[in-house]
């Protein structure tokens, strides 16, 4: 029953969704990395949005966490073959984070997704675009050398780089990070990433 606490007021999930899947070449807003090509009738990726956070009545700026493991398993059973996660656990100190390990129920859910995504209920017949799934997690934004989820070997862990192609000042880091991508940086006057926000709007975030 680990408690997830995240900044809930910044619409991070919607922003990431636009970065991944906003429709390309439709003359509207921004273009996603896998948004297809509207002009040429090429369909982009589809998204399954899994809400795992709950409203916190005591602090509207913070959400209470649900169970990300349940969401990952549900996604595998409902057609997803890539699980993109930019959430994680929070720790009061670097020492507490360094001692942390991935919770067993989350590890099991990740393993389940990798093994069963794209397959039928028997696990023997491929029904999706690929046999088995890929699980991606953000490295985290604590400027620390450890993240228990990112360090789990089957996970593809993504760090963040700034506009000058150095590590973003907030990104966690270490040899367990598999790849890095532009994540924005508020330390630069024009360093944040433009993407979608709730309410048919757009905004810059890091």
Residue ranges and their predicted role:
Residues 1, 147-206:
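Extracellular S/T/G-rich loop segment that most often corresponds to the catalytic His/Ser-adjacent loop
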Residues 98-134, 151-154:
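Catalytic-core regions built around general acid/base machinery
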Residues 27-31, 35-40, 112-131, 184-187:
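Alpha-helix termini
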Residues 140:
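Active-site glycine-centered loops adjacent to acidic/histidine catalytic or metal-binding residues
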């Amino acid at each position: 029953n680990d408690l997830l606490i995240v900044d809930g007021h910044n619409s991070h999930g919607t922003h990431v969704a636009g970065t991944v899947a906003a429709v390309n070449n439709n003359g509207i807003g921004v273009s996603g990395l896998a948004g297809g090509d509207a002009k040429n009738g090429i369909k982009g990726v589809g998204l399954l949005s899994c809400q795992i956070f709950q409203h916190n009545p005591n602090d509207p700026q913070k959400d209470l966490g649900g169970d990300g493991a349940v969401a990952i398993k549900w996604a595998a059973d409902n057609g997803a073959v890539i699980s993109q996660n930019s959430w994680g656990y929070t720790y009061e100190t670097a020492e507490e984070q360094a001692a942390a390990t991935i919770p067993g129920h989350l590890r099991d859910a990740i393993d389940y997704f990798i093994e069963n995504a794209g397959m039928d209920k028997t696990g023997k017949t491929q029904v999706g675009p690929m046999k088995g799934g890929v699980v991606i997690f953000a490295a985290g934004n604590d400027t620390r050398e450890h993240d228990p989820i990112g360090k789990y070997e089957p996970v593809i862990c993504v760090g963040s780089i700034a506009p000058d192609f150095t590590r973003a000042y907030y990104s966690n880091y270490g040899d367990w990070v598999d790849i890095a991508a532009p994540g924005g940086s508020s330390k630069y006057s024009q360093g944040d990433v433009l993407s979608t926000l709730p309410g048919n709007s757009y905004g810059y975030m890091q």
